[in-house]
Design a protein with these regions (language model features):
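Histidine- and/or cysteine-centered catalytic micro-motif in compact active-site loops
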Residues: 58-60, 109
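Short coil-to-beta-strand transition motifs
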Residues: 96-104
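Core regions of eukaryotic protease modules
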Residues: 1-48
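Secondary-structure boundary elements
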Residues: 44-51, 112-115
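Active-site-proximal segments of catalytic enzyme domains
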Residues: 63, 67-97
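Structural recognition of the beta-strand scaffold that forms the well-ordered cores
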Residues: 53-56, 105, 122
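Flexible loop/turn segments at secondary-structure boundaries
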Residues: 61-66, 72-73, 113-114, 129-132
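Conserved catalytic-core surface of thiol
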Residues: 107, 112, 116-183
Length: 183
């Protein structure tokens, strides 16, 4: 996950009290990593293996559902209302303006000709084939940075320091913490 609040250090395991998918089963725990690390992992999986990558995001901001687009500059709310809407990711989570609320799959990535700049991501959504491009959306790279909170990648992609962190006790967050909104 990319848990953006300063009190949740990157490279540490976090858990949510009372969050589990099976009674008596293993607790749901996450490794808190920088958003760029998540992007790099997803891009590598899509580019080298061509397999979809599960992720969780706040799917509502800056979304054009009909046309299937997510972009940070899709709408100019600040210009229309004369109000500054420039909270960063940490502030949006802290003040309950953003949380993971929907799971989808990355199925493609658009890389610029320079080979290093990611422009867009192709997303398979679960809302049916009558919206967007037969159920597929396009996400710009800045939107990923701002609204994607978790990805599922194989442990084999983790550096030693992150693998070691998985062996440490988790920082436990309360049941109502936004990082537990999508289990």
């Amino acid at each position: 996950v990319d848990a953006p609040r300063a009190e949740h250090p990157k490279g540490r395991k976090i858990g949510i009290e009372h969050l589990g998918n099976v009674v008596g089963g293993a607790a749901t725990e996450y490794l808190n990593v920088p958003g760029q690390f998540m992007k790099d992992c997803v891009r590598k999986i899509l580019s080298e293996q061509g397999i979809p990558v599960w992720f969780g995001a706040d799917c509502h901001p800056m979304m054009d559902r009909k046309n299937g687009a997510w972009a940070t500059d899709l709408f100019e709310y600040g210009r229309v209302y004369g109000v500054d809407f420039d909270l960063d990711k940490e502030q949006r989570v802290r003040f309950a303006d953003s949380a993971m609320n929907h799971a989808m799959a990355f199925v493609g990535v658009d890389v610029a000709d320079d080979g290093s700049t990611t422009r867009r991501w192709r997303v398979e959504n679960s809302w049916g084939c009558k919206i967007a491009d037969k159920g597929y959306f396009t996400m710009d790279d800045p939107w990923f940075s701002e609204f994607v909170y978790e990805v599922a990648v194989p442990k084999s992609m983790l550096p030693k320091e992150y693998l070691d962190a998985l062996e440490e006790p988790a920082i436990m967050l309360p049941a109502w913490d936004p990082m537990g909104a999508l289990a």
